[in-house]
Amino acid sequence: GTAIIVLAGVLNALKVVGKRLEDVKIVQNGPGAAGTAIIKMLQVAGAKNIVAVDEHGILYPGRPAGLADHKEWLATVTNPEHLTGTLADAVRGADIFIGTSVAGALTTEMAATMAPDAIVFAMANPNPEIMPDAAKAAGVRVIGTGRSDFPNQVNNVLAFPGIFKGALSVRARDINPQMKMAAAKAIAGLIPEDELNEENILPKAFDPRVAPAVADAVAQAARES
C-alpha cells in the first residue's frame, strides 16, 4: 500500500520540480518490507538509479557487513553507480530521499547536500527522518511524511479500499504491478496540474474521489493485464 502512495507522491512531486523519474537519483533508507516494495514499484514505473541504504550503509553485492536474505537480491538490482559508504555518501547529489527507517536519520547537513529541488518522503512514525521545517531550511523543495499534521501525508488509506474494490469487481486473482501502477497514477491524477505545488502533491486521506478513481483504474488495468 505505502509503495503505491509513494509512487503517486513522487510522480506529482517530480512535476512540481520539473524532473523525470528515469533521470533522478533516489535514495531509499530502510529497505525492509515497505522499503523493498517502494523500490520495486519505482523500478516498475521507470526509475533507473535507486540506492538502498540500511543500518550498515549502502547496499552493494559482496558487502563485508553482510546482506540478509532479500537484501542480497536488492543489492544486485539497485545502485548502478556502485556506490559504497554511509547514508551521507548516498544522499550527496540525490534528487529524492525516501525513508522507511527511524526518526532523525536524515540530518539537515545531509539534506543540504542533495541536488537542487530535492524531494523528501520521510515516513518514520511517529517522528519522521527529518522534520519538514528542517528539510525546507536545508533547501528541500517538496517534503512528505506519514503524519496528518503536515502537508503531503503519505497514507495507505488512499490506496485501500479502492484497490480491493477494483480487483473484486473484475474478479482479479491477484494484484499485479500494472494494477498498482494504475492505482498510483489515479491517485496522482486527482490533483489537477494547476493545483499542484510543494504543499499539495497528494489528495487528502478522506477525499471521497479517491476510492472510486482507484477502483476504476485498477479494474481497467486488471482487464488489460
Task: Please describe what each predicted stretch is.
Residues 41-44, 65-68, 111-113, 134-138, ...:
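Short, glycine/charged-enriched secondary-structure capping and boundary segments
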Residues 2-4, 35-36, 58-61, 104-108, ...:
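Flexible loop/turn segments at secondary-structure boundaries
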Residues 4-98:
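Glycine-rich phosphate/diphosphate-binding loop of Rossmann-like nucleotide-binding domains
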Residues 35-40, 111, 208-213:
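Short glycine/threonine-rich loop-to-helix capping motif typified by GTGT followed
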Residues 4, 32, 81-84, 88-91, ...:
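Conserved structured core elements
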